């Protein structure tokens, strides 16, 4: 992390569990956060309860939306990094971030199902008397 950011600088920053490209609109080097205007979504926020990750059986399963185009959010300074690549168009970046999450979760489901199948087969092999 650099401690010499300037207003107007383009950065990559994290807010809760999402990652964004944005423009610094307010910077206080003595503070703990910078006001960043969202320009693109790099990673969509994770769904569910942050205190119990990967657990669907919680009392409240949070639906987390990405920050909106041009929304200004206070982002922790330790998450800021200089960004020098092309800035994706907001809607296209949101669509891609959402697609990537859906694909990763779908692969995870398929992998888990295959693992369970193999573990059940091994269980029958290890303990045939219990099958």
What label would you give each PLM region?
Residues 1-15:
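Short coil-to-beta transition motif at edge beta-strands of beta-rich domains
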């Amino acid at each position: 992390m650099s401690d010499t950011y300037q207003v107007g600088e383009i950065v990559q920053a994290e807010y809760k569990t999402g990652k964004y490209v944005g423009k610094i609109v307010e910077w206080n080097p003595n503070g703990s956060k910078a006001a960043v205007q969202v320009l693109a979504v790099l990673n969509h926020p994770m769904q569910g309860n942050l205190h119990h990750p990967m657990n669907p059986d919680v009392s409240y399963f949070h639906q987390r939306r990405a920050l909106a185009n041009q929304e200004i959010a206070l982002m922790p300074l330790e998450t800021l990094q200089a960004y020098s690549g092309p800035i994706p168009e907001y809607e296209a970046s949101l669509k891609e971030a959402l697609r990537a999450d859906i694909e990763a979760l779908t692969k995870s489901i398929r992998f888990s199902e295959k693992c369970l199948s193999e573990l059940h087969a091994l269980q029958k092999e290890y303990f045939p008397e219990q099958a």
